[in-house]
C-alpha cells in the first residue's frame, strides 16, 4: 500500500484508496490545514509481531469472512477475545476511514481529530501495534492546541506519528522538535534511493 500511496499521491490532497479495486479518490486538504509527520523510533517489521497480526486477521476471516464486508455485529461470532479485538480494530478502522474522508470534504476539523485519536486508541489497545514511546509521542503532539488529532502511521511497532494541525497557530512548538516535518502542500513525491 505504501507504494500505491506514493505513486498515486497528489500535492495538497489525501488519497482514499479502495484496496479491493485499487481505485483512488483524491480529496483536497482544506486551506489552513497541514499534515505533520514526526519520526519517533526506528523500526523494522522483521522481528515484530506484524506477521502475527497478518495471521490473526486471516484467522478472523476464516470465521466471519472478509473484514472489508464485516460489521461490528459480526464480532459476536468470534469467541476468542484476542481475535475479536483484532477484528474490531479492522472493522472500526474501515468505518473511520470513510468517516474521515467525509469529514475532510466537509472541513470538519474537530471530527477529523476525533477520528485520528480514536484510530490511535484502537491501534494501541485493540490491534496492539503501538508501544509506550509511540503513545508518548502522540500524547505530546496532542498538547499543542493547534493539533486536531494524532496517531501512529504505517505498519506500527515504531516508525512515525502523523498529526493534523491548523496553520494559523505559531510554529514554535514544532521548531523545538527537529524530528517533525511539516508536509508542504505544493510538493509532489519523488523517488528515493540509497
For every predicted segment, state its role:
Residues 158-162:
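N-terminal pre-core extensions flanking Radical SAM catalytic domains
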Residues 8-151, 164-194:
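C-terminal nucleotide
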Amino acid at each position: 500500500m505504501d507504494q500505491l500511496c506514493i505513486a498515486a499521491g497528489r500535492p495538497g490532497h489525501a488519497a482514499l484508496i479502495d484496496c479491493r479495486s485499487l481505485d483512488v479518490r483524491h480529496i483536497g486538504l482544506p486551506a489552513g490545514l497541514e499534515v505533520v509527520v514526526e519520526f519517533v523510533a526506528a523500526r523494522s517489521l522483521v522481528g515484530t509481531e506484524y506477521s502475527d497480526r497478518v495471521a490473526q486477521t486471516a484467522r478472523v476471516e476464516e470465521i466471519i469472512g472478509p473484514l472489508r464486508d464485516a460489521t461490528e455485529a459480526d464480532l459476536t461470532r468470534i469467541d476468542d477475545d484476542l481475535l475479536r479485538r483484532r477484528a474490531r480494530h479492522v472493522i472500526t478502522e474501515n468505518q473511520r476511514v470513510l468517516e474521515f474522508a467525509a469529514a475532510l470534504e466537509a472541513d470538519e476539523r474537530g471530527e477529523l481529530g476525533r477520528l485520528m485519536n480514536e484510530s490511535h486508541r484502537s491501534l494501541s489497545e485493540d490491534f496492539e501495534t503501538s508501544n509506550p514511546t509511540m503513545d508518548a509521542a502522540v500524547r505530546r503532539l496532542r498538547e499543542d492546541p493547534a493539533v486536531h488529532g494524532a496517531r501512529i502511521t504505517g505498519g506500527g511497532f515504531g516508525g512515525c506519528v502523523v498529526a493534523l494541525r491548523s496553520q494559523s497557530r505559531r510554529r514554535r512548538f514544532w521548531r523545538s522538535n527537529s524530528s517533525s516535518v511539516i508536509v508542504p502542500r505544493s510538493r509532489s513525491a519523488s523517488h528515493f534511493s540509497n
